[in-house]
Amino acid sequence: MDTLEEVTWANGSTALPPPLAPNISVPHRCLLLLYEDIGTSRVRYWDLLLLIPNVLFLIFLLWKLPSARAKIRITSSPIFITFYILVFVVALVGIARAVVSMTVSTSNAATVADKILWEITRFFLLAIELSVIILGLAFGHLESKSSIKRVLAITTVLSLAYSVTQGTLEILYPDAHLSAEDFNIYGHGGRQFWLVSSCFFFLVYSLVVILPKTPLKERISLPSRRSFYVYAGILALLNLLQGLGSVLLCFDIIEGLCCVDATTFLYFSFFAPLIYVAFLRGFFGSEPKILFSYKCQVDETEEPDVHLPQPYAVARREGLEAAGAAGASAASYSSTQFDSAGGVAYLDDIASMPCHTGSINSTDSERWKAINA
């Protein structure tokens, strides 16, 4: 009680300006979790909690690396290579941030370095978030290297702008509610920024979840895989809980810190595994699947001018075994690039064009005519 009276006296004094938000005299248990050390060591419980899941996931990635490399080498899919590398990078950055936080002291320079590592980790996580949404809704049917580069360029710029803004607010205007002892804890840009960003991402992911139930599904091609919408629903719920915790903190209710602690732990520890389970597990399994599959709309025409090459089984029934064997490799449409004898060719995904048209390589045009005759 004496300590509380001293704080009240200090805030009411005309000699010292009052802080923007009063610090907590007796730290809440959810605040203690963020900075309390394990015994006499300099290792914090919070850093250890974030380190263990990232280390376990990195071990899993290394264990699956030989089979994953073999599968990627066979398919040569740029989108899977991109996601696999980004998931690896997120795990490594998360481990590096936790290790550095365990080794630095509580000086101001060390605190700034720790916050910069937090922002770097957030930058990579947000880049993957935006990449999944953009590839899924806008460019899912385009899986060439050029489209991947364009998407990554867009997400890099957006993620960098977000991280720089958040980092500037965090370093120059630290949240007084997250100051403990003689240093400031990483506060994600403050309560207000946390609230605004959480509400924004909640609305985005909620819109993605309800898109298949809206009239827009008749106008645009939407992913048909259920895992895509489960992924969006999980992130929408996570941002909703984070926003509620931020609202409580804005009203000086310290219990809101427990809510944001839980969402922060789940996001920085299990977001990369969520990406792997939702989008990469099927690809690296026994039967690879397309990352974003689309339902094809059949358009009826009276006199089609161009015919798709017939399946291999039909060609065999017509007695053209030699031509059918050569045409099977050319007729297997994929949304990824593949190697041919004359070089590298790219085929558009079936969802990106009407189902009654197709592109036939000039070298095989006569062969398709023989099959379709």
UniProtKB/Swiss-Prot annotation:
GO terms for biological process: embryonic cleavage; G protein-coupled receptor signaling pathway; lipid metabolic process; negative regulation of mitotic cell cycle phase transition. GO terms for cellular component: membrane; plasma membrane. It comes from the Eukaryota. Keywords: Glycoprotein, Membrane, Transmembrane, Transmembrane helix. Glycans are attached at N11, N23, N361. InterPro entries: TPRA1/CAND2/CAND8 (IPR018781). It holds the Pfam family Tmemb_40. Its main location: membrane. Ubiquitous, with higher levels in heart, placenta and kidney. One of its GO terms (molecular function) is G protein-coupled receptor activity. The chain crosses the membrane at residues 48-68, 76-96, 123-143, 151-171, 192-212, 234-254, 265-285. It is found in: Membrane. It is a multi-pass membrane protein. Belongs to the UPF0359 family. This is Transmembrane protein adipocyte-associated 1. The gene is TPRA1.
